[in-house]
Amino acid sequence: MLGIDHNKASIEEREIFSFTKKMAADVLLNIKEIEGINGCIILSTCNRMEVWVSCFEEFETSIYEILCSIKKVDDNRYRHCFIERGGYDAIEHLFYMTCGLKSKIIGEDQILTQVREALELSRENYCTDSVLETLFRFAITSAKQVKTQIHLSVVNSSVIHHVVHELKLSNYLFKGKKCLVIGNGEMGKLAATKLEEEGSDVTVTVRQYRSGIIEIPVGCNRINYGDRLEHIVEYDFVISATSSPNMTIHLEQLSNLEFKKPVLFIDLAVPRDIDPRITELKNITLYDIDHFKVETVSDEMKTQLRQIDEILKTKMDEFISWYECRGIIKVVQTLSENAAIDVGLRIDKTMKKIEMDSNDKELLAATVHSATNKVVSKLMFGLRDHVSAATFQECMVALKNIY
C-alpha cells in the first residue's frame, strides 16, 4: 500500500494526488496493466489517498514513481509525504482505518462507505484479485461488526457535526443565521441537515443539468448552482463540500462584492473548493478541513477502543489464516479423495461377500466414499484451526507422501 494522508501532508499536498471517481478508474486500469501486478484498488477521500496493489513477490517497480508519472509531478518533491506499507502492517492499517480509527475524527462513519466504494470501483473495472477482494471484504465486515457491537461515545462523530461543535466552542452561533451550502452530495446533505437542526436558515445549491426531482434536506431552500454568488454577501456562513476537481469559489468572483458583515467560509472538500486567497478580502474568514481537529479521547472511549482492538485482531488473524492457507484447499481435496479411494479398496473384498443387490452395493460404496472424503477434510481443516500455518504446511507435506 502506498498512501498520503493528513498526518504527513498538508491539504495543498494531498489535493495534488487526489482522484475523482472517473480519474481513479482510469488510473486503476493503467496500474493493472503493469507486469507483475495482479490487482489494484484506489481509495481517495478528503483526508487520504491510497493505492493498494496485490503483486508477485519479485515485483520491484515503485508505485510512488508510477503515481508521480501519472500526476506529472517530480517524484523527488513529495516523497516525504507518502508512506508504504506491506504485509501485516498493511492489513492492520486497512482494518483500523475502515473502522474510522485512523481518521481525524475518531470513529467517523463515512470512511467505511468510502472503502466499500473503492472496492466496488475496482470490481467494476475488473482490477481486483482474490487477495485484495478478500482483504477488503474482511475489513468491511469487521468494521460493520464493530459499529454494530460498539457505539463509540464520541459526540458529533461525522465531519460536519465536529465542525459545528468546534465553531460553537469558538463562540459562533448558528440559530437564525443564514447559511449557504454549496454541494448537494453526501457531505453537502449532511452539512445542510446539521445546520438546519441548529436552527439556521439553510439554502442548498443544485445543478440545473441534473434530470428528475432533486432531493434536498427537509427544511432547506434551494437555488441553482449558477446563482450561488448573487446573494452570497447576505449569508453568515458559506460551506462548500463538493467532490468536483474544480473550485466553486474564486477570489476574482468575490473581489468586486462588498461584504458589510463578517462571513465565515468553510471548505470541507479535497481538492479544495474555495480559493484560499479570499482571506485577502475584508470581513472574510476561511477555514478548511485541516483547521478542525480532535483534541481529547475520553476514558470511556479508551475502553471501547480496547474492545474494538480485540475484535479487529481476531478478524485479522482469520484473514491471515485464509491467506496463508489459500493454496491448501486443493491439496486437502486431493488428499481427502485419495483417502476415500483407499478406504473403498480396503473394504472391497468385504463388500463382495455381502449378500446385497448390486445397486444397493453401489449406493453403499458411494456413501462410504463420500463420508470418508468429508471426514478427512473435516479433520484436516480442524487441524488447520489449531496449529500454526507453518506446522499445518508440514503436516500437508507429510500426508502428500502417504497419499
Swiss-Prot record:
Residues binding NADP(+) = G183, N184, G185, E186, M187, G188
Q: Which GO terms describe its molecular function?
A: glutamyl-tRNA reductase activity; NADP binding
Q: Which pathway does the database say it acts in?
A: Porphyrin-containing compound metabolism; protoporphyrin-IX biosynthesis; 5-aminolevulinate from L-glutamyl-tRNA(Glu): step 1/2
UniProt keyword terms in alphabetical order: NADP, Oxidoreductase, Porphyrin biosynthesis
Q: Where is this site: Important for activity?
A: H93
| Top EC class, one word | oxidoreductase
User: Which positions bind substrate?
Assistant: T45, C46, N47, R48, S103, E108, D109, Q110, Q114
Question: What are its E.C. numbers?
Answer: 1.2.1.70
Q: Which reaction does it catalyse?
A: (S)-4-amino-5-oxopentanoate + tRNA(Glu) + NADP(+) = L-glutamyl-tRNA(Glu) + NADPH + H(+)
Q: Which domain of life is it from?
A: Bacteria
Q: Which residues form the active site?
A: C46 (nucleophile)
- Give me any GO biological process, just one: protoporphyrinogen IX biosynthetic process from glutamate
What UniProt notes about the protein's domains is:
Possesses an unusual extended V-shaped dimeric structure with each monomer consisting of three distinct domains arranged along a curved 'spinal' alpha-helix. The N-terminal catalytic domain specifically recognizes the glutamate moiety of the substrate. The second domain is the NADPH-binding domain, and the third C-terminal domain is responsible for dimerization.
Q: State the family it belongs to.
A: Belongs to the glutamyl-tRNA reductase family.
Oligomeric state and partners? Homodimer.
Protein name per UniProt? Glutamyl-tRNA reductase 1
Its encoding gene is what? hemA1
